[in-house]
Amino acid sequence: MRTESELRKHPVQEARFFREGRGEADVLKILIVEDDAQLATTLKYLVEDNPRYLVVATADDLDGAVAAADQHAPHLALVDLQLARGSTGFSVAVRLGDFDVPCLFVSGKAPAFPMPDLALGCLMKPFTAEDVHRSLAMAEDLMRGRETLRPRQPPNLTLYDTVIGGEVDMQPGFIPSRRSLKTRLEHWIAGHQH
């Protein structure tokens, strides 16, 4: 069992799996939010290449993602940052947070700064089947609160929990979200207490 401070680090993910009685061997239900239909189909195929992962729905915008999360209760969402009908992956991640669904961004252009409040990390396009498999395994380890036993992180995957404690290179003019500011302040205070 994890300590209280460890649970605070990833409370949504930890609670979601064990509150519902899921064990280590259960299937991870995944929602794909991608507006390129061909890429969504390819990603679905790559994800389901591993029998431990099941794509329960695909969506191409915010409304579709919210409806799919409400209907299918996925454990993880793979979310593109630029979506159909003016939606963004950021807005999808915020709304999926209301359903306790953690996100892994999948994008051709990564955010210029880490967003641990919104996503576990970002897998950059283009990617290989091996990149997808390793990224899902590492995301699952984070969500289940396991130590990562996979030493080789794909070069195009950035996990935000590994950046939180360190210095973050902010772009000039960037203003983080209120939740992000609160999280960063809490980490700064925790790091400066003796």
Regions found by a protein language model. Give the residues of each.
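Hydrophobic/aromatic residues positioned on beta-strands within the core alpha/beta folds
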Residues: 106-107
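Two-component/phosphorelay signaling modules centered on CheY-like receiver
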Residues: 37-57
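CheY-like receiver
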Residues: 8, 15-18, 134, 141-194
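Hydrophobic face residues on amphipathic alpha-helices
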Residues: 128-132
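Acidic, metal-coordinating helix/loop segments flanking the phosphotransfer/catalytic sites
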Residues: 58-76
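Conserved phosphotransfer microenvironments
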Residues: 79-97
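Conserved acidic carboxylate
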Residues: 34
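A Lys-centered signature of the CheY-like receiver
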Residues: 125
